[in-house]
């Protein structure tokens, strides 16, 4: 496993449950995944000696976040299979490249314009209406590297604030829902989707995921078909996520993709027969798909460092709920906006799960 965050941690649990040994390469000696892995190489992702040791020791390599250098994945591919490939990961590292890829799949991205120099902002006014969001093309996640702008003048100021690096200017769309599809694709090209998730964000960070998504079946099937098409075009192997916007006119727009397991798929740990992490193990190791059926309506709520205040939260209010599962990631320091854990609340009816999950979150506040 390249990367030692919480996604790698939950992958490690799934892999060891299936009898595999896991080696993590991650610079942070206290990372969540390294705490549970069989072996941990503490090194940067571009350390050739460490990568050689890692590649020769492993039967297959996978990743838990998309900002691993593509050159690192290409280097490791000389020793063992790398799943997903450098090509697939590289596609998700640049928002401009990703949006052109979405178009090449015959799908619709959010209206956008490439901003590489200040004069591009004026030129974009014919294709992007304000308000809009200016995002760095690379290295942005969880609301980082993006600024909401209401005019060309604000966009110019934001572009300067972001260092005049390559950016994407995205039109703000009138949303009905935000949804995501977690998809697994095997070495023989077969694909399998998890139930579509509905996502609610706060300050650019996922707050809660609601499953099943409160959308029409036809729209859910269209989202799964779109995600499958993208995976096929990438010759993807592993687990990936595609986020969509559903407009108030019922249009489906691709927001972004992640070539890995995803925060909005954490509900699968408790509400599906097979979790997204076990499915990742199965895909990279050449095993059959696990069953992705939803066993119960579920609401997943993220726990950010915000709820820690000056001490560990009192988990009693949460653990008193017999149908709620707590997952903590083993991070040493709680910070505002940092994902420290999550919980899943299950109920026979979705409304009941929503009510109880919300009640628990209020108590933790």
Residue spans of the language-model regions?
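ATP-binding N-terminal substructure of ATP-dependent carboxylate-amine bond-forming enzymes
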Residues: 1-97, 104, 119, 358
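Active-site nucleotide/adenylate-binding loops and adjacent lid/helix of ATP-dependent enzymes
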Residues: 91-180, 184-203, 207-233, 357, ...
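A short linear hydrophobic-aromatic micro-motif
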Residues: 111, 131-134, 166-170, 240-241, ...
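Short, low-complexity Ser/Thr-rich regulatory SLiMs
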Residues: 183-187, 244-248, 330
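Protein kinase-like catalytic core scaffold
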Residues: 192, 240, 252-256
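Active-site "cap" helix and flanking loop/linker of ATP-utilizing ligase/carboxylase catalytic domains
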Residues: 221-242, 248, 258-307
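Peripheral (often C-terminal) accessory segments that flank ATP-dependent C-N-forming ligase machineries
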Residues: 282-365
């Amino acid at each position: 496993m390249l990367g030692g965050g919480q996604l790698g941690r939950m992958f490690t649990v799934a892999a060891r449950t299936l009898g595999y040994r896991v080696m993590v390469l991650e610079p942070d000696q206290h990372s969540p995944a390294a705490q549970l892995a069989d072996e941990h190489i503490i090194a940067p992702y571009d350390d050739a000696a460490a990568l050689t040791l890692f590649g020769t020791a492993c039967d297959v390599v996978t990743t838990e976040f998309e900002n691993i250098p593509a050159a690192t994945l290409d280097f490791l591919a000389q020793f063992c299979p790398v799943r997903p490939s450098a090509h697939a990961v590289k596609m998700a590292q640049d928002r401009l490249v990703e949006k052109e890829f979405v178009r090449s799949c015959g799908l619709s991205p959010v209206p956008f314009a490439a901003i590489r120099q200040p004069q591009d902002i004026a030129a974009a006014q014919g294709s992007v209406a304000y308000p809009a969001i200016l995002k760095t093309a690379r290295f942005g996640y969880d609301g980082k590297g993006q600024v909401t702008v209401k005019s060309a003048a604000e966009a110019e100021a934001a572009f300067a604030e972001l260092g005049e690096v390559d950016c994407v200017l995205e039109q703000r769309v009138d949303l009905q829902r935000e949804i995501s599809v977690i998809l697994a694709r095997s070495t023989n090209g077969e694909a399998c989707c998890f139930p579509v998730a509905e996502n609610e964000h706060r300050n650019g960070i996922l707050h809660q995921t609601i499953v099943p998504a409160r959308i029409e079946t036809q729209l859910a099937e269209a989202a799964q078909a779109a995600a499958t098409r993208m995976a096929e075009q990438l010759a993807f192997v592993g687990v990936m996520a595609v986020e969509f916007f559903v407009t108030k006119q019922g249009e489906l727009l691709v927001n972004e993709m992640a070539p890995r397991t995803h925060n909005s798929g954490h509900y699968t740990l408790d509400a599906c027969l097979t979790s997204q992490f076990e499915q990742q193990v199965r895909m990279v190791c050449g095993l059959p798909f696990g069953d992705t059926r939803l066993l119960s309506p579920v609401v997943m709520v993220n726990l950010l460092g915000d709820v820690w205040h000056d001490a560990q939260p009192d988990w009693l209010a949460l653990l008193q709920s017999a149908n709620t599962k707590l997952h903590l990631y083993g991070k040493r320091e709680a910070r505002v906006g940092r994902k420290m854990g999550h919980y899943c609340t299950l109920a026979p009816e979705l409304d009941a799960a929503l009510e109880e999950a919300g009640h628990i979150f209020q108590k933790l506040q």
